[in-house]
């Protein structure tokens, strides 16, 4: 991978990820699982920009196909092209104030389950983020967004408790921004 051409998107927008119907690729599935595990750690610790791609690919760890390997190579090429990008934290004028964004990706084609995604920031730096398949099947995008809102609210409670333990009591309500008018109206 040392001599590969770098790319500037972690996942090819034209690729269609679906379950492998051609059978196992043998011992290569262990290599795939190892790569996914290492890239998941990187997405969690330092590179949230690959979290979405990693979330999708991790679903195919048990039985990957060549398309899934191609997608992992795309992520590695992306990391090579963006090697100087990472998280940096600076002094925040008001560290006890954090806010968040949430979204839901409605009903994937494989299991018809939606994905909840959120990111919370202190100042302009991400302090926590997540992307998780919802356990239920949402019938409407508004329902999927409302589930994401609920899951993000749990993260808010955890962050407020953590900040309180660190001596930073957040007196104001936590701002959580979403893009679905129906779920906002229900909240």
PLM-predicted stretches and their roles:
Residues 1-187:
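Divalent metal-binding acidic/histidine catalytic loops
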């Amino acid at each position: 991978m040392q001599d590969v051409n770098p790319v500037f998107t972690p996942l090819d927008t034209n690729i269609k990820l679906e379950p492998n119907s051609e059978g196992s690729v043998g011992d290569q599935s262990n290599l795939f699982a190892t790569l996914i595990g290492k890239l998941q750690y990187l997405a969690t610790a330092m590179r949230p920009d690959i979290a979405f791609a990693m979330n999708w690919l991790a679903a195919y760890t048990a039985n990957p196909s060549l398309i899934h390997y191609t997608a992992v190579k795309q992520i590695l090429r992306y990391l090579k092209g963006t090697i100087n990008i990472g998280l940096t934290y600076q002094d925040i004028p008001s560290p006890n104030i954090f806010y968040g964004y949430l979204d839901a990706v409605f009903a994937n084609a494989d299991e018809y389950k939606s994905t909840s995604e959120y990111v919370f920031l202190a100042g302009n730096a991400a302090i926590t983020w997540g992307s998780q398949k919802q356990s239920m099947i949402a019938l409407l995008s508004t329902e999927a967004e409302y589930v994401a809102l609920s899951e993000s609210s749990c993260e808010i409670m955890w962050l407020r408790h953590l900040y309180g333990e660190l001596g930073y009591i957040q007196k104001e309500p936590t701002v959580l921004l979403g893009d679905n008018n129906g779920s906002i109206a229900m909240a």
